[in-house]
Regions:
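Helical lid/core segments from catalytic subdomains that handle acyl or acyl-like groups
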Residues: 1-56
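Intrinsically disordered, low-complexity linker/stalk segments enriched in A/P/T/S
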Residues: 4, 17, 58, 70-73, ...
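A generic structural micro-environment signature
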Residues: 10-12, 56-59, 83-85, 103, ...
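C-terminal functional regions of eukaryotic proteins
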Residues: 26-27, 51, 75-80, 107-122
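Flexible, Gly/Pro-enriched loop and linker segments at secondary-structure and domain junctions
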Residues: 43-85
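C-terminal structured interaction module
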Residues: 86-124
Length: 124
């Protein structure tokens, strides 16, 4: 397990190349939370934590926040294994947010955009 800061790029090929370079350059003896600590020190919370469990299909995920006073100021997401259901490829995507900064309309918009993107790439 390791936290990596991967900058957003509109162009997927550029995003993938940078993500691949960052992920494959993780030191074995490094601090798995080093990137997160640096961001916190800088006051930069413009992040989304995304975990992937590609070998597991799930119906729900529960997150435990161990740090006292942590209001969870960033979304926690988990993507799971894609499976075939009724001739369609589906996968679980869980998101945990603090209602102090995210409303239901934000979640509706987010999942709507995910659905649009998946429809777009499924027709390529």
């Amino acid at each position: 397990f390791y936290t990596v800061r991967i900058p957003y790029h509109e162009d997927f090929e550029r995003f993938y190349a940078e993500a691949h370079a960052l992920i494959t350059d993780i030191p074995e003896d490094g601090d798995p939370y080093g990137a997160e600590k640096i961001l916190a020190e800088q006051g930069d919370y413009d992040v989304v934590h995304l975990s992937a469990v590609p070998k597991m299909y799930f119906t729900s995920i529960t997150y435990t926040l161990a740090e006292a006073g942590n209001g969870c100021s960033y979304p926690l997401m988990t993507a799971g294994k894609a499976v075939s259901r009724e001739g369609r490829l589906v996968f679980p995507l869980s998101i945990y947010v603090n209602h102090a900064f995210v409303d239901g309309s934000h979640l509706t918009s987010f999942f709507g955009k995910v659905e649009e993107y998946l429809k777009e790439i499924s027709h390529k």
